[in-house]
Curated annotation (Swiss-Prot):
Gene: rpmC
Organism encoding this protein: Campylobacter lari (strain RM2100 / D67 / ATCC BAA-1060)
Gene3D superfamilies assigned: 1.10.287.310
Family annotation (InterPro entries): Ribosomal_uL29, Ribosomal_uL29_CS, Ribosomal_uL29_sf
GO CC terms of this entry: ribonucleoprotein complex; ribosome
Cross-referenced HAMAP family: Ribosomal_uL29
Entry keyword set: Ribonucleoprotein, Ribosomal protein
Protein name: Large ribosomal subunit protein uL29
Amino acid sequence: MKYTEIKDKTAGELATMLKEKKVLLFTLRQKLKTMQLTNPKEISEVKKDIARINTAISALK
């Protein structure tokens, strides 16, 4: 997900996306602990997506 895709969304859409990504990050961390995660790089990608969404939210303020 790129910042250009995110910046045109409304605050409500961004909040929903942020919540979904945080839930996804939580489940990925659980899978990592139980050795079920096949690609650990997914965690860093989701964390970067969360940072991009937070940047877009702060830009709206």
